[in-house]
Amino acid sequence: MRIALLLALLVPFQAPADPVVTPTAPIALFNGHDLSNWEADIPARDKDPGLRPSFVIRGGHLVSLGTPEGHLVTRQQYRDYRLESQYRFTGKPGNCGLLVHASVPRALYAMFPKSIEVQMNSGHAGDFWVIQEDIEVPDMEKRRPRAPGEKWGGAEGDARRILNLTDGSEKPLGLWNTMVVEVRGRAITVWVNGDLVNNGVNASVDHGKIAVQAEGAEVEFRKLVIGPLPPV
């Protein structure tokens, strides 16, 4: 019992598993006031609980401060949805991402939850990074480069990055970007500022939690809304 309680405190978003929700109306994942819909997993805080928070609310925005590195994860699991985010880098360009289908925490490099990342890294918004999961795209040989002897996959040492279609859809630094992610079954489609930037199929998973990264750069989010899919 004592061990189970300790594990729950260390990795609160792993268990118990919540029912999987398919949205029927728009839901604001961030309510503008608090982080009651989220749980943070910041590995460095295991050894130093006094570290500053990685995620704060400032001026009505959700802010990923970038460090200490980690993830802010929804309490709820979702499937078949449209996720719209509006974000901007506040200082220097840098790295961040939205993770969909998040499940097992710290599944890669003792940091990243098992998931499929939709990249927000400056200049590369819309790349996929697979984390102990997988997905396929057209032109795999071209868009998923691998070194000799390297295989496609989501584990350490695998070719995990899948290049986007544009690398030119982001707005200048400091301006707000809109990223839309649609999840239909095992397909994931991504738009940045109206441009189609990625479309993957045959994902290894079709549901899970949603996570925001703290990965070195400060990023503000003024909108994180999940809702039903539009008609095809």
Where on the chain are the PLM-derived regions?
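Carbohydrate-interacting regions of secretory-pathway proteins
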Residues: 15-232
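Sec-dependent N-terminal signal peptides
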Residues: 3-12
